[in-house]
Amino acid sequence: MSLQISPIPAHPQGECFLTAAEGRVILPASIPVDTIGRRIQVEWDPDAPVTPLGQLVFFCQFLAAGGLYSKWVAECPLRYTSPNAPKIRDVLGTWVLGCLSGAWRYAHVTALRGDKVNPQGLGMEKVVSEDSLRRAFQNEDRVALACWQKEALLRTYAPALEQPWIADLDVTVKPIYGHQEGADIGYNPHKPGRPSHAYHTVFLRTLRVALDVDVRSGKEHAAMHGLSNLWSLWDRLTPGQRPWVVCGDAGYGNERLMSECEARVQKYLFRQRSTTKVGQLVKLLEQRGGWQPLLDGWEGNEGLLQLTGWTCKRRTIVLRRKRPESAVGLEKLPLLTGQEVELVSGPVYEYVVLVTSLEENLLSLMHLYRQRADVENAYDELKNQWGWGGFTTRDLGRCQVAACMVAQVYNWWNLFVRCAEPSRAREALTSRPLLLHAVGRVIKSGGQTKLIITSNHAEAREVQDILSKLSLFLSGLTNAAEQLKSEERWRRIWHRILEPFHQQATALLGGSG
């Protein structure tokens, strides 16, 4: 007769709390937690109307006053046929909340689904799931989506184009770790051999506003691949809205772009790489002399340059400065980083060569080029603080949609911060804890809804003053001036943003902020 051996569970049950029917664990109402120095009773309240983004209500007021958000939602070409599909307003609102909270993957929006306060401020019913957000634009027409997003971006920055401004061109590389469309091996200085996407972007200088972005495969990182998007943007603008000058780094100083600028009577300022003929020009200027002292030890001279393949000679500016005695000094150069400095001739000086169609003096041209450093800061903020290049999917089309989504929310938030405190600019790393993060608790009584905000920021008093003044300004636009259309209200918001720029005629050509 065989022995009957009873199975022994691998994990002893111990003490547990079970319901009689389902056999589910019953969690205790409170848990004693022994911390350093004292015991604390912990309770959960998953249904409490609270939010960690309590000050988002002021951003919602900002969007409502400008009328941009409602029009953005109304014109969205996204269409659902299933009765169980999420609402378009919920999908777009989840995008806004996700970007503002610092998400860079679709899975990150799951952390927002318990927020029962902020979705109401954006006219939402709920925060949608990550799968709904990921699949939202999967089967939509790419042309219709591009037109919708480009028009929304244009409405955001259009009032700023009524005065002279500078368009900065740049491209950044985003490493890809999956098998996405367009993930090709191209130029990738930080991770050589790693597939990537290339983001070709046009920025509005000084205000750090992203005008447009074009996502390309990793092999299409050269400047020429972003020209079609540049001229598409340029053609959408009226003659009075077009940039005063287009600026770019060494990759943009080529015959194709410069000849197209000249055909459109568009002024430009581009840096040149070190080539044989560039070196010959520098040697010629060294022999001729006549260097003018400029700023921070830099001197300038100019001549005419025609490289092989160029159709004509062009004005070329050469800037030089004595090389530091050590590499440490080189890293501290205020004009260009060590990677951007190119030695063209001789061991004594370092040189920067610019080609331009402008007629301004050498000091003005040097100042214009130095301001390009702000574009690098904007790229750094978008990639590291806004998750630009995140929200990656297998198809390149949705990566393009995600890049424009992030750019749109980035613009709105930056302008909100500027409107709240026009005298200074803040990156998201400091502006979110200051103007967004705070515990918000909703109390409903007597038919009214009250939001009680508690901020743990050291400058909470100053923040309360800043946001209160902003709210009064926005309320004045919507209440005291009800006859104003949304476009005029948005124009007045821009007027407040540009107040710190003392010379309005040249506000966006440099200066404050």
Question: Where do the model's predicted regions map?
Answer:
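An anionic, glycine-rich sequence signature occurring as long contiguous blocks
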Residues: 3-4, 27-38, 42, 267-377, ...
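Short amphipathic alpha-helical "interface-anchor" segments enriched in bulky aromatics
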Residues: 62, 109, 362-405, 409-413
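Domain-level cores of phosphate- or acyl-group-handling catalytic modules
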Residues: 220-280
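Short secondary-structure boundary/capping segments
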Residues: 181-186, 260-266, 283-289
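Flexible loop/turn segments at secondary-structure boundaries
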Residues: 116-119, 174-176, 209, 219-220, ...
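Basic, amphipathic alpha-helical segments enriched in Lys/Arg and hydrophobic/aromatic residues
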Residues: 389-453
